[in-house]
A protein has these predicted regions:
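Active-site cofactor/cluster-binding pocket
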Residues: 1-155
Length: 155
């Protein structure tokens, strides 16, 4: 069993990377994992690049630093691929998931892709966490469908 899995999210402010990280953390927490989810902001304006982090493992997490060498990188805005920060600390064999849909619920769809890439959390746990945290913004059915769509796109 892997001791600690670390995910670094890259997006622009307002695209939902922080929220996606929180949804993933909630789903993992409910499967018995220890989790951390936190954002790192630059200038606080809509559209500015930002990072969010998700860290999880089977034991309590004692570190509280930014993720420098991620096990998985998620990019919600493909225009950020040219940013050096996206490649920072990324090994040649590190998976990088890139949203190319540009859809309104891209962050939710990418949650499904992350779960498929990692093999956890279970799809239903992720769907329920999305409904719980985002149910006021979209219908439960739309959220479940978006997560499932991302999960089905694994390749």
């Amino acid at each position: 069993m892997r001791e600690l899995t670390e995910i670094r999210w890259h997006a622009r402010a307002g695209q939902g990377a922080k929220t996606a990280s929180q949804v993933l953390a909630l789903a993992l927490l409910r499967t018995g994992k220890s989790v951390q989810s936190f954002p790192e902001y630059g200038p606080e304006r809509r559209g500015a690049p930002l990072r969010a982090y998700t860290r999880f493992g089977p034991r309590p997490i004692r570190r509280h630093d930014a993720i420098e060498h991620p096990d998985l990188v998620v990019v919600l805005d493909e225009s950020l691929l040219d940013e050096p920060a996206v490649r920072e600390g990324v090994a040649d064999d590190t998976p990088v998931l890139v949203n190319r849909s540009g859809g309104r619920m891209a962050n939710v769809e990418m949650l499904g892709a992350v779960a498929a890439a990692l093999g956890e959390p279970p799809l239903d746990a992720l769907q329920e966490a999305a409904v719980e945290l985002l149910g006021g913004k979209s219908s439960p059915e739309a959220l479940r469908d978006a997560v499932a769509e991302g999960y089905a796109c694994r390749s």
